Amino acid sequence: MSLQQTIEQAFENRNEYSPATMPQDVRDAINQVLEQLDNGTLRVAEKKDGEWVVNQWAKKAVLLSFRLNDNYVQAAGEHVQFYDKVPTKFANWTEAQFKEAGVRVVPPAVARKGSYIAPGAVLMPSYVNIGAYVDQGAMVDTWATVGSCAQIGKNVHLSGGVGIGGVLEPLQANPTIIEDNCFIGARSEIVEGVIVEEGAVISMGVYIGQSTRIYDRETGEIHRGRVPAGSVVVPGSLPSEDGTHSLYAAIIVKKVDAQTRAKTSVNELLRLA
C-alpha cells in the first residue's frame, strides 16, 4: 500500500484512533508525511500548469497527526514551557542547521514541526503552523500568523499582525494561498482558502474570506475567493440595492504590472490609489 493510500484509509477510520490505539504503520506513515512537509519535499498545495492543486491526502495526514500524541511539556529555555502535542520545528536545531537552512528566526518566533521555512525567509516574532509552506525571501513580520497548511510565496511580505487562515479550525477544504511577490498590509486577514495572486498589494486592515466581495472599481466586476494578480486592494464598502445601507467590501483601486511594482514602493502605490 502506498503512503497516500495508507493515509487515505486511516483518515476514514480516524475516529477509532487515539495515541494509545494508533497502529504503528499508520503512525509511521503520518510521521513520514510530516517529515516531508517539514523539509519541503511535499506540499499541501502546489501550482501545476498555472492552477493550484491541493494534495488533500497530505492535509489529511496533518489532521491525523493530532491523534498521534497526548499533550506533553516542552521546555523552551530556562523560564518558558509549552504544553502541546506537536513539537516545535527549531527545538533541537544546532547553529550549523540554521546556517544550512539559511533562515533567520527572531525570538520568540515559533514554527511548528511539519512547516517548511525556505532559505532567505525571515521570521520576526510570529507563528507558523503545521503544514504551512513559507517560500524563499518571505518576511513574516511581528505578530503575524501563518495558519495550518497555508502557502506563502517567494518574496512575500506579511506585515505586522497579519493573519493568514489555516485549514484546521474551522475545518477548511483548501488552504489559503499568497502567491509570489505579494504585500499584505498590517492587521489584514486573508482566510478560508482565498488565493491572493502574484504581485497583489493588500492595504492595511483588509479582511477577505470566501464570501467577501472584491470589487474592481475600473471594470465593475466582483470577485470572490480570489484577488487577481497585480491588484492594489483597500478596505471599503458597497451600497445595498435599496440604498439604505452599505456593507463591507474589499476594493481593487488599480492594477499594476511587475515592471511598475518593481519601480514603485508599496507606500507610493497605496497613496496614489
Swiss-Prot record:
The keyword Cell wall biogenesis/degradation does not apply. One of its GO terms (cellular component) is cytoplasm. One of its GO terms (biological process) is lysine biosynthetic process via diaminopimelate. Pathway: Amino-acid biosynthesis; L-lysine biosynthesis via DAP pathway; LL-2,6-diaminopimelate from (S)-tetrahydrodipicolinate (succinylase route): step 1/3. One of its GO terms (molecular function) is 2,3,4,5-tetrahydropyridine-2,6-dicarboxylate N-succinyltransferase activity. It is an enzyme of class 2 (transferase). It is found in: Cytoplasm. It comes from the Bacteria. It holds the Pfam family THDPS_N_2. HAMAP family: DapD. This is 2,3,4,5-tetrahydropyridine-2,6-dicarboxylate N-succinyltransferase. It comes from Psychrobacter cryohalolentis (strain ATCC BAA-1226 / DSM 17306 / VKM B-2378 / K5).
